[in-house]
């Protein structure tokens, strides 16, 4: 079966694993999923990310992060730009998620960046997702 939106599938798998408090999540690898996972790690939303190479496309192993009392670090993830409706932001109109408490993941000419990094580099791009 052909998947029309692998990014939405990736975000949904993270959301579902987070809801039931799984420690580890494995998803089929792709370059954009690797980029999103690395941003989540860099911003402190997940503990660690491993890329496991195999004979096929590879697997991304995401280690989810929880607080001391088991509270979720990722409250929600939302896909913004979809295959049927692409959403772009100019460098001056970069979105802020919950007044800076969350992040927007932006696909730019310089690769995947957070909204803050895109503002610093003065670039716009496609708004992939919001994470808070």
Curated annotation (Swiss-Prot):
Biological processes per GO annotation: translation
Protein's recorded name: Small ribosomal subunit protein uS8
InterPro entries: Ribosomal_uS8 (IPR000630), Ribosomal_uS8_CS (IPR047863), Ribosomal_uS8_sf (IPR035987)
Short name of any one Pfam family annotated for the protein: Ribosomal_S8
Molecular-function GO term, any one: rRNA binding
Originating organism: Streptococcus pyogenes serotype M49 (strain NZ131)
NCBIfam families xrefs: PRK00136.1 (NF001109)
UniProt GO cellular component terms: ribonucleoprotein complex; ribosome
Domain of life according to the entry: Bacteria
Family matches, as Gene3D superfamilies: 3.30.1370.30, 3.30.1490.10
Alphabetic keyword roster: Ribonucleoprotein, Ribosomal protein, RNA-binding, rRNA-binding
Family named by the database record: Belongs to the universal ribosomal protein uS8 family.
Keyword Ribonucleoprotein attached: yes
PANTHER family: 40S RIBOSOMAL PROTEIN S15A
